[in-house]
Amino acid sequence: MQIERLGEDDWERLARIRVDALRTDQDAFGSSLAREEGFREMHWRMRLRSSTWFVAHDDGPADVGLVCVIQEPGADDDERHVVSLWVRPEHRGRGVARALLDRAASDATAGGAARLTLWQVEGNERAAEAYRAAGFAPTGATTTLARDPSRREVRWSRDL
């Protein structure tokens, strides 16, 4: 498996895997399939300029996972935040999430970060296992899930 950092000219590749992710796991993201299917080239390019995206692929033609790293507004300068981690269902449990998170961590470290954070929806134990295996630990902070106030998210952190 290889992990690649996407550049602005990879906008079609990002669009393809992101829309696939939304088709497969509609509740996994803070966005919707209808919204992102309507994005134009400029929207995808803007995403690639404003954040760091990585994709995982194996020997086949399709990308098998993705992750995005951002500088969260209001966060410490030495903190980066993981969003949009997704792995194709048939590749889950094979180390793809770990490889993506490790690449995100090494890139964040190279950029001067000392900590990587993320939010996990309560009850998603498979995600919790992947985060723990990648060196993350719950911080104790929780929040209400914006798109569904009946659900909560748990904050995780990994020192780099």
Predicted regions and their residues:
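Active-site acidic-Proline motif in GNAT/NAT acetyltransferases
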Residues: R88-E90, R94, E122-G123
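Residues that form or flank phosphate/diphosphate-binding pockets in enzymes
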Residues: D77, G95, R126
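Acetyl-CoA-dependent GNAT
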Residues: E8-E90, R98-R103, D107, G111, ...
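Alpha-helical elements of the RecA-like P-loop NTPase motor core of helicases
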Residues: E12, A128-E129
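Extreme N-terminal starter segment of soluble prokaryotic enzymes
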Residues: M1-I3
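C-terminal "cap" of GNAT-fold acetyltransferases
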Residues: A114-T117, V121-A128, A134-L160
